[in-house]
C-alpha cells in the first residue's frame, strides 16, 4: 500500500467517524471547498454544490436521518495523481450498501468531492460471482 492510499483510507475513515458520531462540523471539514462536489444518498435525487451537499449531511446527522450505526467494511483505495476513490460496503442495521467515495487533494489534504451509496440486494438474491 502506498502512502497516498493510506492517506485516502484515513480520510475515508474520518468520513465514517463523522457519520457514526453525527458530527456535522467534522463532516463539513471533510468536503472539498474548491473543487465541485456532488452526493447521491440512497433514494435521493443527486445533489450538486457544496451548500446542497453539506446541508444534506447536516439534516441527516442532526434530524434523525442517519442509521443508528454504520460501519465501513472492505475499503479499497485507488489513487490517480491528485484524485482518489474508495469503494467499500456500508454495513447498517438490516443490510449493506455499496459506496463509492471520491477525493481530491486540496492544499495537501484529501477532501471528499463525491459520495454515492446504493442498497445491495440480500445475500440470497445477489448474482453469481458477487464478491462479499
Where are the model-predicted features located?
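Helix-to-beta-strand junctions that scaffold the AdoMet/dcAdoMet cofactor pocket
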Residues: 32
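A beta-strand edge to alpha-helix "cap/lid" segment located at domain peripheries
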Residues: 1-29, 37-132
Amino acid at each position: 500500500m502506498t502512502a497516498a492510499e493510506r492517506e485516502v483510507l484515513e480520510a475515508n475513515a474520518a468520513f465514517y467517524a463523522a457519520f457514526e458520531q453525527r458530527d456535522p462540523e467534522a463532516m463539513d471539514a471533510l468536503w472539498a471547498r474548491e473543487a465541485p462536489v456532488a452526493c447521491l444518498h440512497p433514494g435521493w435525487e443527486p445533489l450538486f454544490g457544496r451548500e446542497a451537499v453539506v446541508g444534506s449531511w447536516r439534516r441527516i446527522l442532526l434530524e434523525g436521518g442517519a442509521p443508528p450505526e454504520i460501519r465501513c467494511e472492505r475499503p479499497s483505495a485507488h489513487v490517480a495523481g491528485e484524485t482518489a476513490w474508495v469503494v467499500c460496503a456500508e454495513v447498517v442495521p438490516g443490510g449493506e450498501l455499496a459506496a463509492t467515495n471520491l477525493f481530491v487533494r486540496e492544499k495537501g489534504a484529501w477532501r471528499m468531492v463525491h459520495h454515492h451509496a446504493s442498497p445491495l440486494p440480500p445475500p440470497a438474491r445477489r448474482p453469481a460471482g458477487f464478491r462479499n
